[in-house]
């Protein structure tokens, strides 16, 4: 299968690992994080120092706090946020989800 853009919504440890594995498999990854400063740090250092310090991340990951930018052009979107945030994050994302995108929830628990 040829490479396509994948998005990961949620900058915690699980989202970071999903983003990295996806990038290592040849896909460009739009990676949404709540914090713009953390997104900038990840883009600069290729590391998520808050959740996975000293773990080098693939350079195909592009972090942003802009939801529209994160999901634009994605064919597959992983949502990796806490269950307490899931409803709000997905509601915020709905206007930007490409029509043919597949949405996968990796959220543990029920709101």
Residue ranges and their predicted role:
Residues 57, 69-72, 76-79, 83-111:
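Rossmann-like NAD(P)(H) cofactor-binding subdomain of soluble oxidoreductases
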Residues 1-53, 62-65, 92:
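NAD(P)+-binding Rossmann beta1-loop-alpha1 motif at the extreme N-terminus of oxidoreductases
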């Amino acid at each position: 299968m040829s490479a396509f853009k994948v998005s990961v919504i949620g900058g915690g440890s699980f989202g970071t690992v999903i983003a990295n594995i996806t990038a290592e498999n040849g896909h460009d990854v739009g990676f949404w994080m709540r914090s713009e400063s953390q997104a900038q740090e990840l883009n600069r250092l290729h590391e998520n120092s808050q959740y996975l310090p000293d773990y080098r991340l693939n350079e195909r990951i592009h972090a942003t706090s802009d939801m529209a930018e994160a999901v634009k052009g994605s064919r597959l979107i992983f949502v990796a946020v806490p269950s307490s945030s899931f409803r709000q994050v997905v509601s915020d994302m709905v206007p930007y989800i490409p029509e043919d995108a597949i949405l996968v929830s990796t959220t543990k628990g029920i709101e």
